[in-house]
Amino acid sequence: MEAHMPAVAEMLKASEAAVVSRVSLRDVNRVIDEHILPEAFVSLDNGRHVLAGACSLIAFYFESARRLTSEERLFAIRIAEGRLARARTLPWSALLREDWTVHHEFLTIDLMPFMRGASERLDDLAAAREIVTSSPDILGGTPVVRGTRVPVYDVAASVAAGHSVERMLEAWPSLDAEKIRLASIYAEANPLRGRRRVFGDLPEGSVIVSDRRVARRRKTG
């Protein structure tokens, strides 16, 4: 089944926007708190949300920091604001045909690479959403990779722990490399609350790559 790509006007959770913008959640909160991102592209109702199309502007702001001053970056975002506001009802295919060049005196900034990058990562987010399912009949409603009983967050924890794809495929033969990649994206976009899973939390039947244990010294005296 082909994944449905989020629309330009869809409001993404802050954690999803961080994935699409390829920045940290802290950076997303910063562009909201410091009004770097225009208020028209932000919603604070029922949590923080960001316009999907505006993720391109977040990516631009941070990726261009070494080459452009904050004033130049903010100027470009303000110019792009009107264009994006007018184009927010368009599909992404049409948005990518728009002119995203910003001119200011001797400075020319091309925002198209950031638009294209955000579009590609939104495709990944849509695909990640598509492979995840949850049912009370499967592991008590734990999110799993569709068609399997493999918990999504266990796969993501294994990726974060540095396990190789080959080892993970041995542990979960019902997966493939693409599903592992998308499971990691889903978990990053929808982080669990509380303590993160750690190395020893791999599910029953999975393969542990290494297990170093250090004996505690007994206290003397």
Swiss-Prot record:
State what protein this is by name: Uncharacterized protein y4eO
Keywords from the UniProt entry: Plasmid
The record, for Pfam families, names:
DUF433
Q: What is the lineage of its organism?
A: Bacteria, Pseudomonadati, Pseudomonadota, Alphaproteobacteria, Hyphomicrobiales
- Disulfide bridges in this chain: none
InterPro entries, per this entry?
DUF433, Homeodomain-like_sf, WH-like_DNA-bd_sf
Q: Does the keyword Phosphoprotein apply?
A: no
User: What domain of life does the UniProt record list for this protein's source?
Assistant: Bacteria
Keyword set includes Transport: no
